[in-house]
Amino acid sequence: MSMLSDNFDFLLLSGCYLEMISFGVRMTRLDFSRPQTFPGVSPYTVSFCVEAGLKYRIGSVVGQRNFADSSTSAPLLDFLLMDVQSVEEVKPATLQITFCTGDKILVEPDDTGDYESYSIYLDSGDVIVI
């Protein structure tokens, strides 16, 4: 399993909101964006493609995305258009995204360390693979 680098920018979602959530076979994609500042200027975007653990807390509801149970995907839709408050590493390679409401998404690495857990597609075109 790869780890986050020492110079990982935890402000990468500063000023962003969750614009879109996509579900695929064994994958959840979270697309974040900053509001467009001027016409004709492409907005800042960052995407997380999660293939391993994805947990969430919305109000008092705590859940985990289970690829075999599509009903575990529905609560994630409540995060749409929420502003990001912070991103922090709560355990090695485990990122917690906290929203302005206090609700959270936890992106976790693969327990076995044998597979890619998640990829972060940065606005610059760089990709971070964990």
Language model features: what each stretch is:
Residues 1-130:
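Surface-exposed, interaction-prone regions used to assemble/regulate multi-protein complexes
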